[in-house]
């Protein structure tokens, strides 16, 4: 890896680490504020706080454990038949070897839009799903780059990271909701104010979690660019093709799994890439998205391509 590529990757890591530290500090500050409110106003019971924490944790763990099976049902994904998809399985094994991890299991998703996603759990193991339309629009090199992106998610344990930090806004929201009913009636006004403050804090935490997710996507893009031969360029054309052929995935809870979640007009692939290179993208362009704006992804890949 040449120095410039190392610098680009180090910058992404530093931003991600800084944001995670910020989340931790903010979470600690929220707990301190809540403890002070409890001490001054007696708004909350420690037993209820513990109960809410255990309930949310159990719900998240259950979702993590059985999530892949739910994803398989929603996206109609089935384990790839080696006799039919042996060449794709071979690419997955090749890319996994380049990344130094055990090959994940390949699944084929029978949905109408082109995309790919990685998912895992301690029970289901590591999986990569590719939708059938994606196989029809990407060449082998582009498919290899997309798989490099998805394996990057698995290598960096992104599902576990997002699940862990996603606990914070969920917990704060439940604390806010139950504060309205668990406080001393003499402090009803204080309870309402505290609940509203906590709901705002929960919303802000969700924005931060989305930001972390966008950085994980950039990190996965960098993984493909730096571990797959000509990965940056092939990932650019793959992204453009996916958008050009109309990904219908929206910003839903499941869309965080996907390689891309933007709908745009049909344009020539190269024209679209050039458009993204020069597009002015504001800070609010992807504030509520779990994926970076395509223009940001293309520019990052340009930097990685130039430095490789």
UniProtKB/Swiss-Prot annotation:
MF terms from GO for this chain are:
metalloendopeptidase activity; zinc ion binding
Question: What's the cofactor?
Answer: Zn(2+)
- Tell me, which GO biological process terms does this entry list? proteolysis
- Give binding positions for Zn(2+): 149, 153, 217
Q: Extract one GO cellular component term from the record.
A: plasma membrane
Topologically, how does it sit relative to the membrane? Multi-pass membrane protein
What keywords are annotated for this sequence in UniProt? Cell membrane, Hydrolase, Membrane, Metal-binding, Metalloprotease, Protease, Transmembrane, Transmembrane helix, Zinc
* Disulphide linkage map: none
Quote the record's cofactor note.
Binds 1 zinc ion per subunit.
Transmembrane stretches, by residue range? 16-36, 39-59, 161-181, 192-212
Report the top EC class in one word.
hydrolase
Which residues does the entry assign to the active site, renumbered to this chain?
Answer: 150
Q: Which Pfam families match?
A: Peptidase_M48
Domain of life of the native organism: Archaea
User: Where located?
Assistant: Cell membrane
In the Enzyme Commission scheme, what number(s) does this protein have? 3.4.24.-
Q: Which CDD domains match?
A: M48B_HtpX_like (cd07338)
Give the family per the record.
Belongs to the peptidase M48B family.
Q: Which HAMAP family does the record cross-reference, listed alphabetically?
A: Pept_M48_protease_HtpX
Name of the protein this chain belongs to: Protease HtpX homolog
- Please give the organism: Thermoplasma volcanium (strain ATCC 51530 / DSM 4299 / JCM 9571 / NBRC 15438 / GSS1)
Phylogenetic lineage: Archaea, Methanobacteriati, Thermoplasmatota, Thermoplasmata, Thermoplasmatales
């Amino acid at each position: 890896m040449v120095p410039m590529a190392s610098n680009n990757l180090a910058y992404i890591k530093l931003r991600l680490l800084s944001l995670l530290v910020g989340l931790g500090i903010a979470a600690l500050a929220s707990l301190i504020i809540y403890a002070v409110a409890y001490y001054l106003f007696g708004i909350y019971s420690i037993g209820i706080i513990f109960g809410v924490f255990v309930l949310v944790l159990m719900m998240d763990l259950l979702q993590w454990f059985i999530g892949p099976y739910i994803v398989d049902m929603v996206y109609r994904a089935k384990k790839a038949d080696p006799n039919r998809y042996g060449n794709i399985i071979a690419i997955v094994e090749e890319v996994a070897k380049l990344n130094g991890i055990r090959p994940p299991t390949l699944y084929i998703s029978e949905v109408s839009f082109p995309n790919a996603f990685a998912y895992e759990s301690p029970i289901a193991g590591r999986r990569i799903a590719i939708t059938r339309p994606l196989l029809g629009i990407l060449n082998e090199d582009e498919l290899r780059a997309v798989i490099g992106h998805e394996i990057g998610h698995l290598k960096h344990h992104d599902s576990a990271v997002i699940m862990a930090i996603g606990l914070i806004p969920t917990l704060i929201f439940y604390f806010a909701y139950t504060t309205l009913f668990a406080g001393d009636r003499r402090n009803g006004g204080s309870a309402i104010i505290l609940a509203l403050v906590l709901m705002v804090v929960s919303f802000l935490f969700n924005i931060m979690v989305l930001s972390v997710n966008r950085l994980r996507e950039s990190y996965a893009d960098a993984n493909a660019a730096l571990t797959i031969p000509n990965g940056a360029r092939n990932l650019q054309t793959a992204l453009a093709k996916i958008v050009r052929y109309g990904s219908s995935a929206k910003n839903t809870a499941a869309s965080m799994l996907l390689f891309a979640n933007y709908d745009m007009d049909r344009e020539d692939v190269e024209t679209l890439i050039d458009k993204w290179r020069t597009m002015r993208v504001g800070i609010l362009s992807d504030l509520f998205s779990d994926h970076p704006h395509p223009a940001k992804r293309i520019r990052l890949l340009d930097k990685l391509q130039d430095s490789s």
